[in-house]
Amino acid sequence: MREFLDRAQAAVGDDGRLPLGAMTEWDVFPFEREGLRARALTDYANPEPDRRKAPADCKTCAALDRADLVLHGGERLAVIRPGGCNLPFVANIVSRAHEPLDELDDDGHVELGRLIGRTYAALRALEGIGNVHVSKWENGTGHLSVTLLARPLGVLQLRGSNLAAWADMLPPTPAEELDARAAKVRAALAAR
């Protein structure tokens, strides 16, 4: 994919940066266009560096060992939550071992699909949730990680693909609120 980066590099302006895209005009984009600029593109990296962490340094492995953070435990996949977040609720469907999505077999894919649907429904049923956004980013620990982010009802500016950027700027949700929601999600996942 070197040609992809070459094509992108050919599109940079005089300042060495790509022009801002149409997303900056969206009403849900979290930043004002004025003064905003893209970072300069980095060099091509192939092979890519190994970003997996040793189990002793892995936050996902640590979370899997904490009963208060585990919402559902299966043999191969689990549903966990972060210790804190800035949204009404966040859940992660993760592999118990350092196993990315492309290493799951068909049974793992079936289990993942069921857990996405069940976890989505559990979060969507929480009071005050307007929608649940589902995404997959597994670029850090070596675990499969599908993230489900609960958007608060009526806060339309947080709609869409910028929810994670907004969440990074919002104040922390009180722990007691997260704990109460975790109990409801845990019960919903256990009920099936």
Region locations from a protein language model:
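Active-site microenvironments that recognize anionic phosphate/pyrophosphate groups
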Residues: 1-91
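C-terminal helix-cap and adjacent tail motif
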Residues: 17-18, 28-35, 152-192
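Glycine- and small hydrophobic-enriched segments that form the cores of compact globular domains
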Residues: 73-79, 101, 111-114, 139
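Short, charged/polar surface micro-motifs in flexible loops or helix N-caps
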Residues: 85-86, 99, 152-155
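Short histidine-centered catalytic/ligand-binding loop motif
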Residues: 91-115, 166-174
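Active-site helix/loop of acyl-thioester processing domains in fatty-acid/polyketide metabolism
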Residues: 110-126
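A short glycine-rich, hydrophobically flanked beta-strand micro-motif that places a catalytic Asp/Glu
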Residues: 127-140
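A short beta-strand motif that forms the metal-chelation/ATP-contact edge
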Residues: 144-151
